[in-house]
Amino acid sequence: DTIGFVFQNFQLMPRESALDNVCLPLIYAGVSKKDRRQMGMEALERVGLSDRADFKPTQLSGGQKQRVAIARAMVNHPKLLLADEPTGALDSKSGKQVLELFESLNESGVTVVVITHDRKVAEQAKRIVHIIDGEITEEGQEAGNEKEKEN
């Protein structure tokens, strides 16, 4: 079983193409070059960027960079995907696309854990855990209950 990780600031290799960035975990997993390319293209297709496979990060928008980072995180078909502030550097449209992608991954059986300070992002979750100074202060709140709690 593998874990995927989406960094807050993408962490893409600037001199490598989107496809090469996505394929990096497969190199460490010992996947053949032929299989890496196929798996990388499938991951880029899933995030809607197969037409940008040869683009360098400097040629991509912030939302596209984040989707490349998500493709890289999911290329090994992880059971768990951790995302650190995945929408923090994105405009609202790109942020919505990222959250929809996470929802799709979750529906396909991937456990997605999103770390965020953004209440609107947290409200999209099935379960919310509040942590302050390393301590869990609330747990198990269902999505959509934020408004009830505030009233």
What is each PLM-predicted segment?
Residues D1-I131:
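ABC family nucleotide-binding domain
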Residues V121, T137, N145:
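Flexible, glycine-rich phosphate/dinucleotide-binding loops
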Residues I128-Q141:
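H-loop (His-switch) and adjacent beta-strand-loop-beta switch element
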Residues A143-N151:
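ABC ATPase nucleotide-binding domains
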